[in-house]
């Protein structure tokens, strides 16, 4: 093969790489493991951690205990469910359209909404899009979001807003973990106010009071959440 491509040694293939950038010795890695050995190794590592049905998890921040039905794994094994891309050819995506319809129906019932959309990648992008929609509807250029919203959500919103020139304001939280709604009075001409409940700390916000205060200032109210199943209790 080397003769076919016109070189004498394997090192000639890397001649464009400076010698001081080349690895001089073997990589500092353990010996390779078979799949069986690797499985045993990972089980041993997992056994060192306090986890499992015998423990209660209070990590929070999006890490919650869930029961996942076996049907979920089966459905995820089907190629038409691997992507969150919205199908535009219904004759090619009947299974995906069925799943989206079921999701929207259940989400609308759970949240008490007339309609629900499924064409967003996750809650963070949906939050950002909702705030941008509020700006378009109201014609205002400022929004306020609670700092008790999950940090990953807030980072996505900041990324969306970075090139727009719109103003993104923070609502602080109190020692109780709840959003300081009184600070809304310090902001004027807001297009929207966003609050998450249950919030990042697991506190249940007074969503009705937050919405009424936002509406009093002419702003739209955006309610976010990271754990949809919490609304089965709330």
Question: Residue ranges of each PLM-predicted region?
Answer:
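Compact, charge-rich alpha-helical regulatory domains located at protein termini
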Residues: 1-24
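Conserved active-site and cofactor/substrate-binding residues in soluble primary-metabolism enzymes
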Residues: 5-8, 33-40, 80, 95-102, ...
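Structured loop/turn residues at beta-strand edges in well-structured enzyme cores
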Residues: 8, 113, 188
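Structural signal for hydrophobic packing residues in well-ordered secondary-structure cores
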Residues: 17, 21, 42-51, 104, ...
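N-terminal entrance/gating region of PLP-dependent enzymes' catalytic architecture
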Residues: 19-102
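Conserved beta-loop-alpha segment that forms the PLP phosphate-binding cup at the N-terminus of a helix
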Residues: 34-39, 104, 116-140
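Short loop-beta-helix segment that forms the pyridoxal 5′-phosphate
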Residues: 88-92, 96, 109-128
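Conserved PLP-enzyme active-site core in the AAT-like
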Residues: 125-234
């Amino acid at each position: 093969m080397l003769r076919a491509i016109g070189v004498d040694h394997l090192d000639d293939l890397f001649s464009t790489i400076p010698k001081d950038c080349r690895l001089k010795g073997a990589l500092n890695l353990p010996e390779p493991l078979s799949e069986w050995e690797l499985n045993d190794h990972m089980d041993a590592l997992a056994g060192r951690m306090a986890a499992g049905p015998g423990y209660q998890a209070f990590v929070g921040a999006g890490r919650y205990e869930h029961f996942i039905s076996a049907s979920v794994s089966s459905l995820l094994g089907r190629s038409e469910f691997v992507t969150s891309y919205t199908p535009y050819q219904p004759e090619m995506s009947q299974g995906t359209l069925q799943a989206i319809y079921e999701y929207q129906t259940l989400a609308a019932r759970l949240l008490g909404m007339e309609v629900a959309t499924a064409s967003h990648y996750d809650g963070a992008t949906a939050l950002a899009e909702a705030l941008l929609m509020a700006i378009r509807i109201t014609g205002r250029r400022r929004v306020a979001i609670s700092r008790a919203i999950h940090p990953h959500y807030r980072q996505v919103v900041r990324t969306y807003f970075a090139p727009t020139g719109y103003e993104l304001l923070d609502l602080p939280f109190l020692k109780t973990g709840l959003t300081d709604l009184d600070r809304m009075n310090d902001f004027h001409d807001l297009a929207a106010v966003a609050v998450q409940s249950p919030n990042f700390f697991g506190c249940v916000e007074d969503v009705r009071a937050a919405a009424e205060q936002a509406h009093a200032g002419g702003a739209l109210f955006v309610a976010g959440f990271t754990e949809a199943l919490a609304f089965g209790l709330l």
